[in-house]
C-alpha cells in the first residue's frame, strides 16, 4: 500500500505474547523460544489475521512449523481450551490482564505490532464515520496503550 494515499492514526503499539494457563508446563518461563512453542498444541486465530501471518512467518524463518490444532476467532472458546493446561495461543500483551486465568509470556524475539486505523484521503467521509474516527482517537488518548510521545497521526 502507498501510505501517502491514506490518513492514519496509530492507536496502540503492542507485542504478541505466548499465552498458557497458570498450570501449563511453560507457565513459569520468563520468555519462550520458537522451538519451545513449536512443540506445543497451538490455537491460532483465523487464517486471514495479520497476527497469524506474522507468527507463521516467524516460525518459518526459524525453521519450525507451528503445531496448529485449531483456528478460532472466538477468544472465549480459545480460553476454554487453554484452561485444560494442554494448549497455548497468542494474544496481544495488552489483553492478558483482562483474563486472570492465563499468563502471557514474551517471545524470545518479540513481535511488535502497531494497531491503528487508516482511511483513504481521496474519499468523502460521512459525519457518522468522522464521529467514529474522533471517538476512537479520543478513547485511545484516554485509555492509552502507548506513551503520548510516540503517538502519530497522519490526518
What is each residue range found by the language model?
Residues 5-16, 20-42, 127-129:
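Flexible hinge/capping segments at coil-to-helix
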Residues 21, 45-46, 91-92:
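Thr-Gly-centered strand-to-loop micro-motif
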Residues 44, 70, 88-89:
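Conserved SAM-binding loop
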Residues 52-65:
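Ligand-binding cleft/hinge of the Venus flytrap
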Residues 65-74:
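Short beta-strand-to-loop elements that line the ligand-binding cleft
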Residues 105-146:
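A late-sequence structural motif
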Amino acid at each position: 500500500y502507498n501510505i501517502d494515499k491514506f490518513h492514519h492514526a496509530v492507536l496502540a503499539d503492542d507485542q504478541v505474547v505466548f499465552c498458557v494457563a497458570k498450570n501449563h508446563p511453560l507457565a513459569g518461563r520468563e520468555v519462550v523460544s520458537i522451538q519451545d512453542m513449536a512443540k506445543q498444541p497451538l490455537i491460532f486465530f483465523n487464517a486471514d489475521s495479520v497476527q497469524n501471518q506474522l507468527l507463521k512467518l516467524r516460525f518459518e524463518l526459524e525453521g519450525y512449523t507451528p503445531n496448529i490444532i485449531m483456528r478460532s476467532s472466538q477468544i472465549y472458546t480459545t480460553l476454554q481450551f487453554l484452561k485444560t493446561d494442554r494448549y497455548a495461543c497468542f494474544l496481544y500483551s495488552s489483553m492478558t490482564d483482562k483474563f486472570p486465568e492465563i499468563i502471557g509470556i514474551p517471545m524470545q524475539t518479540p513481535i511488535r505490532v502497531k494497531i491503528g486505523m487508516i482511511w483513504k484521503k481521496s474519499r468523502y467521509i460521512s459525519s457518522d464515520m468522522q464521529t467514529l474516527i474522533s471517538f476512537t482517537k479520543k478513547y485511545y488518548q484516554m485509555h492509552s496503550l502507548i506513551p503520548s510521545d510516540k503517538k502519530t497521526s497522519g490526518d
